[in-house]
């Protein structure tokens, strides 16, 4: 017997590491990272798709991105929340930012505003049974709704979002709100 529970997926030979609570899973061999908590789930998408947590699944992404879904209802888990925030965070750098090498580990010049955000296309599914008639909105950096996005429920009950951040009105944003239609 060891410190980790028997169902823990840690496999050092395959460079897979899971926390003792099961909330964090890192696959070093595939540059993957999955965070699973009752109200927040996130995945790091680099190369291998699809990537799935428990309720959140990234079916496709045209660029590397961190994707997360969070319940905005204080006491409700992600799958039962009627108000969600999805974050699709791609590469973001200050204008004129410079590094000492291509791997960008040491900053040579911090750069200046505006921040340049890499655009991307993604297909994201969230298993949620509370939102019967969902509506999705791109949010600006100030939290205001900028435009409505198409969202649909699949036959197996998932909420499905497909979007291209390069086509958002007002420019790219990593933030999408999902709520019941008003």
Language-model segments: which ranges?
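Long, low-hydrophobicity ectodomains and other hydrophilic envelope-associated domains
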Residues: 1-138, 154, 160-162
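Surface-exposed loop/turn and intrinsically disordered segments
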Residues: 129-130, 142, 181
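Surface-exposed loop/edge segments in extracytoplasmic proteins
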Residues: 143-151
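C-terminal beta-strand-rich structural cap/linker in extracellular carbohydrate-active enzymes
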Residues: 157-182
């Amino acid at each position: 017997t060891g410190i980790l529970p028997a169902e823990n997926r840690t496999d050092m030979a395959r460079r897979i590491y899971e926390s003792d609570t099961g909330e964090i899973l890192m696959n070093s061999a595939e540059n993957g990272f999955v965070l699973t908590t009752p109200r927040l789930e996130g995945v790091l998408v680099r190369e291998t798709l699809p990537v799935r947590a428990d309720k959140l699944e990234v079916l496709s992404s045209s660029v590397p991105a961190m994707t997360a879904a969070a319940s905005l209802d204080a006491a409700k888990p992600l799958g039962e929340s009627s108000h969600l925030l999805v974050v699709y965070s791609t590469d973001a750098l200050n204008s004129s930012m410079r590094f000492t090498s291509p791997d960008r580990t040491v900053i040579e010049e911090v750069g200046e505003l505006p921040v340049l955000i890499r655009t991307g296309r993604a297909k994201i599914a969230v298993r949620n049974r509370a939102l019967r008639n969902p509506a999705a909105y791109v949010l600006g950096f100030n939290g205001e709704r900028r435009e409505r996005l198409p969202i649909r429920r699949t036959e197996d009950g998932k909420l499905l979002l497909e979007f291209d951040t390069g086509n958002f009105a007002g420019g790219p944003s990593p933030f999408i709100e999902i709520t019941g239609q008003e």
